A protein has these predicted regions:
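Short beta-strand edge segments in extracellular beta-sheet folds
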Residues: 134, 252-256
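Accessory carbohydrate-binding/adhesion or oligomerization-edge regions at the termini
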Residues: 1-30, 107-113, 118, 127, ...
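Short, hydrophobic beta-strand segments
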Residues: 96-98, 214-225
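Solvent-exposed, conformationally flexible loop/turn segments
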Residues: 44, 103, 157, 205-210
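Extracellular recognition modules
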Residues: 109-111, 234-238
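Active-site mouth of glycoside hydrolases
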Residues: 86-102, 116, 121, 172, ...
């Protein structure tokens, strides 16, 4: 079970593409829990990936972004541990830069352990969501480092407030700059016309630090996102180091207002919408938990044909593709975090992680998903036992953590 070493001979290993769910292959076993499909999802699995990095890229930064790994992920590069995440539904980033080998073979090893992960439904097993290798300049937009809010929306104009976090990974201070351009997006994610832009804005970054700045842009005659017409825009942030373009970071968003009222229910853009939703687990039935965007879109089209207009991501963070589809197809989303808090429902469930990880897992979900117009609310839990002990203050605490990263919902 020590397969992270660089020199491990993996030539005889099975070759496959991720996303991958090893458990859906079966076989079914009568002795296993029916709640998790009587499938052999509990076990330990290893993945290894070889890749080369050009010697020309020695001054670049390299990251691996995982959308989800089931579960208790540990990640190594060339035998050196670079990070991981225990919660199988959380996205996370690891920094590969210190251990990258240039001009020769690099090996990423990922160990997953679902034996120490409890679930009340079928979770799948493996690297079941997408992984991306990210290469950047030392001065770049931080991970999920753009937050677009829309404080003013009228028929005549709208205001987009763009909050940008820029990182400086150099060993010296940098006088940087950034610009923001806003474009219309069509249904196929193609950029249409530019509708707003800024001049270059200066930012001073000390060595090894990040800086957050914000700018407001006025968009004339905004097209509002709604369930019938899913108009979207793109905020394009360009970062400069000594007038050299070092990063371009795109963030889709939409103009829309949401309001819950005591006498007229939910209002989208000032108009009442009867929420008709379903609670959706992340698996794709017989296809398992491995992300398949076409299969997921099929599920959503079937639900819409029934009259469904809303989704609850029961009971965990969804794949990013779900929210992308909800934005495009016109669905409202309750974006959910946890099935339990400090009191568990199954052995080795999230209650064993709550104290150490809940704030980080909240930050991850909210920062990743807060720009989606389809997301109308955050859910911090499902049928939690602590609801009978409000004096503990956990619900209030979780709401406060959410609002650190999103004050708009």
């Amino acid at each position: 079970d020590s397969l992270e070493a660089y020199e491990v001979d993996d030539t005889g290993w099975r070759k496959l593409d991720v996303p991958h769910d090893w458990a859906i292959e079966g076989p079914f076993r009568i002795d296993l829990d029916g709640y998790t499909g009587k499938l052999p999802w509990q076990g330990i699995g290893w993945y290894r990936k070889h890749f080369e990095v050009s010697s020309k890229d020695k001054k670049k930064r390299f990251y691996l972004d995982f959308d989800g790994t089931m579960a208790n992920a540990e990640v190594w590069l060339n035998g050196k541990k670079v990070g991981g995440r225990p919660f199988g539904y959380s996205s996370f980033r690891v920094d590969l830069t210190p251990y990258v080998l240039y001009g020769t073979d690099n090996v990423v090893a990922v160990r997953l352990d679902t034996e120490k992960f409890g679930s009340r439904w079928y979770p799948g097993a493996g690297i079941y969501r997408h992984v991306r290798l990210v290469k950047t300049e030392p001065v770049h937009v931080a991970h999920w480092g753009v937050f677009v809010t829309t404080p003013e929306i009228t028929d005549t104009y709208a205001t987009a407030s763009v909050h940008v976090e820029i990182e400086n990974n150099r060993q010296y201070a940098v006088k940087g700059q950034y610009t923001v351009d806003i474009y219309e997006l069509d249904a196929n994610d193609n950029i249409s016309k530019k509708v707003a832009s800024t001049a270059k804005r200066p930012v001073f970054l000390d060595a090894g630090t990040s800086v957050t700045d914000s700018v407001s842009l006025r968009v004339e005659s905004p097209k509002r996102w709604n369930l019938e017409h899913t108009y979207r825009y793109l905020a394009c942030v360009s970062v400069f180091d000594k007038n050299k373009l070092t990063d371009v970071y795109d963030t889709p968003f939409g103009f829309r207002t949401i309001l819950f009222t005591h006498d007229n229910g939910f209002l989208l853009n000032g108009k009442r919408v009867q929420i008709q939703g379903t609670c959706n687990h992340h698996d794709l039935g017989a296809l398992g938990a491995a992300m398949n965007k076409v299969a997921l879109e099929r599920q959503l089209r079937i639900l819409k044909s029934f009259g469904c207009n809303a989704l609850r991501t029961s009971h965990n963070p969804p794949a990013p593709e779900l929210l992308e589809l909800a934005d495009k197809m016109g669905l409202l989303v309750m974006d959910e975090l946890f099935d339990c808090w400090t009191v568990g429902k199954k052995k080795n469930d999230y209650s064993t992680l709550f104290d150490k990880w809940h704030e980080k897992d909240i930050e991850t979900l909210v920062c990743r998903d807060r720009n989606h117009p389809s997301v109308i609310m955050w859910s911090t839990g499902n049928e939690v036992h602590e609801q009978y002990e409000p004096a503990k203050g956990i619900a209030r605490h979780l709401a406060e953590v959410v609002h650190r990263f999103d004050h708009t919902r």
